[in-house]
């Protein structure tokens, strides 16, 4: 699958046409990467230098959460994302640090886009930035609702499937 086809399937790029997607694919930092089962893609607290688009496979997004009875932090599954999903979006939102840890749940193929490159593209082409930001807000809202449910119910790992908003 071409990089443009991968972006066409991604939830935050759905509002863009082929010429806009080509501008993203042509960024010097846009490249494909692969990760093996259980390989850490990034960790919470690291600088968010790249946006990731999942082309193939599944990725666990985990947060370190303490329980009411303990101050120890334990990894808590926030969601499992699949093909067409975006992760690593903090590269687009200051202060540009990852808040979750991403781990390959299977062998994965990812399209990686440099954060500074795509932010500069948004300044050059504000309509691209607007469309991506509008769609990104839906992704963030969905993940926020997931975290709310974890806090309200006290359940860990409440999502074991791809959320409905991915359309996959």
List PLM regions with ranges:
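Cytosolic regulatory regions built on CNB/CRP/Popeye-like sensor folds
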Residues: 1-168
